[in-house]
Amino acid sequence: MVRLGDELPVSRTGPLRSLDPDQACNQVTGKTKIGTCGFGVAQAEYARTFSCVEVQHTFYQPPRLTTLERWRTEMPADFEFTLKAWQLITHDAKSPTYRRLKRNLSETEKAEAGSFRATAIVNEAWGATLAAAKVLKAKTILFQCPSSFKQTAENIARMEKFFCSIDRQDLNLCWEPRGDWNAEVVRSICVSLELCHVVDPFIGETVTPDRYYFRLHGRSGWRYQYELGELKELATSLVKSKRGYVFFNNSKMTEDALKFCKLLDEA
């Protein structure tokens, strides 16, 4: 499905590669910013090619603030970081992603982590996420939920309490629900809590088309490479007057992002 309504991290692709100097996507295409989830090439090369990146490390274990400061100073002033909120906010401790957590949790902390619970460890995780965003001068934070975070009255109530109580600091907060969530329920949550709905546009349709955030994970998995026709379909569906992000998160993310930049320019 590709519709938009009617209107430094280590790459998973293996060793860092060099980009063709004739390839560049460092301009903002209309109001759409294009990049990858993590760096697939050396950071200096990436900055000459793209205008933004989605930071993955903050989800697993936020780096030291001094490390984030270095990332910020090494990139151009107008380069944009978006980042994923720490998993302690969204994912229960039984999630396999906790294998990359670099701290030992007590049994109490394990029971109180994740699912937007009103607990000390979730509040601490939000504070760490907010601190990372401040250092990176990030304007957008993504809350990615696992498919185990079901559409229940309890989970919705937890979300409402969390987002109504935190210090948002005028940040653009984005939510990526996974699993079987009803579109009208998602729309209601996003409107009432002022959230941007995050989707893979080849799988679902965003309920917040005026400010979209697309994450392309590969139609049949991470190793998938998008065909030119698929990227053209997405490019023509975007309304350039609207603001949004398109991040590639597949094995060929850098190449696909570059192809998409060119197609969007031509659309």
Put a short name on every predicted segment.
Residues 2-5, 11, 16-267:
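Residues lining hydrophobic/aromatic ligand-binding pockets adjacent to catalytic sites
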